[in-house]
Amino acid sequence: MLLGPRWYVDDGCHTEHLWGNKKKNKGGDDFPGTFEVDDFGAGVRCCSEDGTTCKTIGKCPGTASHSEAQEKCEGKGMRLCTKDELLTEICCKTGGNCDNHQVWTSTPEPSLLPFLITMYLTLVVIHHRINNDNVLKI
């Protein structure tokens, strides 16, 4: 699937280089954060409803789609963590080797549609003003 909604994916922890095996954990950002389509494979880290705890489901590198990850979290009475929650490092040291691998979040990619609609309407107004008055009034 090339088109469709995309969700934020990032490595499960960015501070693991500050603790543990320094040879294994060379840096804090193993993967840059990206937005991926549903069938991209990533690990599953779930947050409690109030966002105060995180649990890893399975192992990383993960192969779950976004839909599968959501189902796994819901099956545990939890939900996928948001991008903001993941970046607080709440999920560090919760297992599955996911500190160093990509995991799903519930954060969707911001849509360009509102921006494109605003730009289109702005151009329509400018065109109308130029054609009606021969003078651009802003």
Model-identified regions with their sequence ranges:
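Secreted, propeptide-processed cysteine-rich mini-domains
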Residues: 1-23
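Eukaryotic intrinsically disordered and solvent-exposed regulatory patches
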Residues: 29-33, 66
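Short, structured beta-strand segments at or near domain termini in extracellular proteins/domains
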Residues: 33-55, 96-112
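Conserved hydrophobic ligand-interaction patch in extracellular adhesion modules
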Residues: 1, 61-107
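Extracellular secreted precursors and ectodomains with disulfide-bonded cysteine-rich loops/domains
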Residues: 11, 44-45, 52, 58, ...
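Residue-level signal for mature regions of secreted extracellular proteins and peptides
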Residues: 5-7, 39-40, 53-54, 66, ...
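Low-complexity, Pro/Ser/Thr-rich intrinsically disordered segments
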Residues: 110-138
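Disulfide-bonded cysteine-rich modules in secreted/extracellular proteins
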Residues: 3-9, 53-69, 115-117
